[in-house]
């Protein structure tokens, strides 16, 4: 028999990890001509890696308390589709990647069916909703965490947890040169889902240029500033205006690059461009020069500095090591509720890992163009502020690796470590797969 592995991710970062994990699992089975069936929820990268995506992650990805309520009918419809697939296919093991709003409910379903659950990338229970610990204790067999302090948090609460390192910390720096990225002539790391500058000519029919200020190519002789508004439509539309206002205030001495999450559809990209033109750039006398790109890592690597919406992208920015400013804005109701529930001093993971304010955080009312520009003007030129942040970010990168010399882990990267743990779970649950599943 062929083992069936359920892999589920709901956001752009988790979807990347799901795709890398799917590829690693296939490599485990391939040498002896065996295979595993991979099903779950994901996006284009997971599908390209061989996962049969029963539900598309973009159909479930919403944010905030009020936003979730607005999309409940669609969420319930897609959730029922997932449950039907789980009952019909009866996976050997389930791997749930972050996205707790959906995955805790799925974990309950797997528990009912006697299917072991491995949770990869912990929900931020140490920050809020600690009552969900009981759900982890009841429905999750193994918690695999990507931040070092999370292992202690779970073990102190009687939950088996292991720090496997951060997947992004294992990636080499982007190999594309500044000039190549400017031309959009190279695909980063040979990944079929990463691209250079995103051409507006690839948008659906009827999409128009925006004020003449969206370009398909960057000027390699100017310094670039990356603007990362998020990976989901509501947060992108919420964060983009403040970022563009800051770019206009800073001026055309710089060019501005906006990486678009690979989980976004062409229709969503077109909607973002319309919003940019009709709502944002239309009111700016001297609009900044903007280029959309597909590869966030290369954008962060080649940008002189970045403005990054709070989320996984802040980890990516910290690992790249160039200075950045963290921003975020949600609805007033969402923010009011979050202030009562969140129990940490910082929102940026770089600051949480460091235990101090390494990167500036501009949240809600502090998220203004003036404040962004004030911080960027300190970080863009060579000087103490820039060098101090780069040094602190280097220390954070080291903290996100598992070091064999310290008696922890091995020489595998985070994804390979997770794959090996999944294989062992399959061997325990499905002895007939042991020979086929040997690494």
Q: At which residue positions do the language-model features occur?
A:
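Nucleotide-activated sugar donor-binding and catalytic core shared by glycosyltransferases
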Residues: 1-439
């Amino acid at each position: 028999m062929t083992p069936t592995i359920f892999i589920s991710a709901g956001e752009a970062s988790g979807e990347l990890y799901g795709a890398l994990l799917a590829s690693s699992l296939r490599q485990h089975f391939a040498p002896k001509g065996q295979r595993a069936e991979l099903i779950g929820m994901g996006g284009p990268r997971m599908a390209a890696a061989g996962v049969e995506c029963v539900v598309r992650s973009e159909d479930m990805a919403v944010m905030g308390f009020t936003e979730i309520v607005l999309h409940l009918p669609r969420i319930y419809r897609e959730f029922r589709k997932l449950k039907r697939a789980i009952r019909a296919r009866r996976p050997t093991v389930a791997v749930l990647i972050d996205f707790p709003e959906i995955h805790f409910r799925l974990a309950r379903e797997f528990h009912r069916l006697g299917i072991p659950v491995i949770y990869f990338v912990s929900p931020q229970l140490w920050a809020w909703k600690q009552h969900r610990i009981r759900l982890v204790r009841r429905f999750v067999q193994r918690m695999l965490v990507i931040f070092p302090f999370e292992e202690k948090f779970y073990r102190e609460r009687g939950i088996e947890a292991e720090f496997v390192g951060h997947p992004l910390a294992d990636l080499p720096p982007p190999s594309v040169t500044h000039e190549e990225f400017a031309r959009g002539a190279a695909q980063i790391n040979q990944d079929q889902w990463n691209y250079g500058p995103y051409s507006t000519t690839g948008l659906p029919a009827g999409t128009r240029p925006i004020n003449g200020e969206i370009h398909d190519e960057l000027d390699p002789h100017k310094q670039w500033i990356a603007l990362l508004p998020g990976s989901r439509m509501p947060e992108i539309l919420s964060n983009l205006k403040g970022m563009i206002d800051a770019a206009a205030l800073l001026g055309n001495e710089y060019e501005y690059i906006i990486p678009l999450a690979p989980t976004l559809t062409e229709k969503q990209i077109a909607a973002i461009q319309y919003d940019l033109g009709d709502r944002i750039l239309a009111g700016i006398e001297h609009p900044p020069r903007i280029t959309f790109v597909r590869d966030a890592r290369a954008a962060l690597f080649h940008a002189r500095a970045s403005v990054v919406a709070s989320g996984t992208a802040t980890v990516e920015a910290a690992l790249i090591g160039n200075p950045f400013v963290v921003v975020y804005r949600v609805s007033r109701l969402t923010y009011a509720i979050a202030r009562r529930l969140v129990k940490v001093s910082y929102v940026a993971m770089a600051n949480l890992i460091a235990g101090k304010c390494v990167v500036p955080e501009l949240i809600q009312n502090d998220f203004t163009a003036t404040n962004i520009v004030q911080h960027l003007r300190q970080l863009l030129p060579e000087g103490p502020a820039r060098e101090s942040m780069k040094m602190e970010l280097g220390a954070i990168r080291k903290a996100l690796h598992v070091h064999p010399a310290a008696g922890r882990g091995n020489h595998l990267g985070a994804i390979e470590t997770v794959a090996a743990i999944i294989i062992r779970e399959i061997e325990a649950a499905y002895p007939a797969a042991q020979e086929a599943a040997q690494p």
